[in-house]
Regions:
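Alpha-helical transmembrane segments
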Residues: 63-86, 168
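Transmembrane alpha-helical segments of multi-pass membrane proteins
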Residues: 77-78, 106-130
Length: 188
């Protein structure tokens, strides 16, 4: 590990030196950051089976629920934002690969990446992974869902007037993850 850092500082280009010398919250390569965004997007695929398995229970708990649960809209928003962050990381990698950078510019790019990754992780975590995890927990345990409703936590509360159906959002998660991976591979 320390020999890798020494090699990057002594023999690497300006970006490798900046990446080795700059303290970062997420010490991942740009490719790793792009793939992390893709993995989070792929988690949205679990939304459809998690809600479909509890269709009867949802009808009992939310009798007037014709619209999909509000968490579906949250996951849709998170998917769009996470996909955009993934594209920004693809562009960032293109900049690093095609431009000659000095150490100061490279350091600024590394810090910018870290800030962007902070937002990408928080968006993906809060808007995709947490809702999917809650809905999966509900799919695995109907007793948990009933308990949450007794505590006035309406896990399947409907979203009024939403175009984001469960199937569309699950499919969009798979498509966006695939597109991001294809763009990442094509620009490598």
């Amino acid at each position: 590990m320390s020999s890798d850092i020494s090699d990057a500082v002594l023999d690497g280009d300006a970006y490798e030196q900046a990446a080795a010398l700059t303290r970062r919250v997420f010490p991942l390569s740009l490719t790793g950051k792009i793939r992390a965004c893709s993995a989070v997007l792929a988690a949205a695929v679990l939304l459809f089976p998690a809600i479909t398995t509890r269709r009867e229970l949802i009808a009992q708990l939310e009798p007037a629920a014709d619209a999909p649960p509000a968490l579906v809209s949250v996951v849709a928003l998170g998917s769009a934002v996470t996909f955009l962050f993934g594209l920004v990381f693809v562009r960032q990698r293109h900049v690093v690969d095609t431009r000659t950078l000095d150490l100061e510019t490279a350091t600024r790019l590394v810090r910018t990446e870290d800030v962007l990754m902070t937002f990408a992780v928080s968006t993906g975590l809060l808007f995709i992974l947490v809702p999917v995890a809650l809905l999966l927990a509900g799919a695995l345990s109907s007793d948990l869902v009933v308990y949450l409703y007794e505590q006035d936590i309406r896990l399947y509360r409907p979203a009024g007037g939403s175009y984001a159906t469960t199937a569309r959002v699950s499919l969009a998660g798979a498509v966006l993850a695939s597109v991001l991976l294809l763009v990442e591979a094509a620009t490598r």
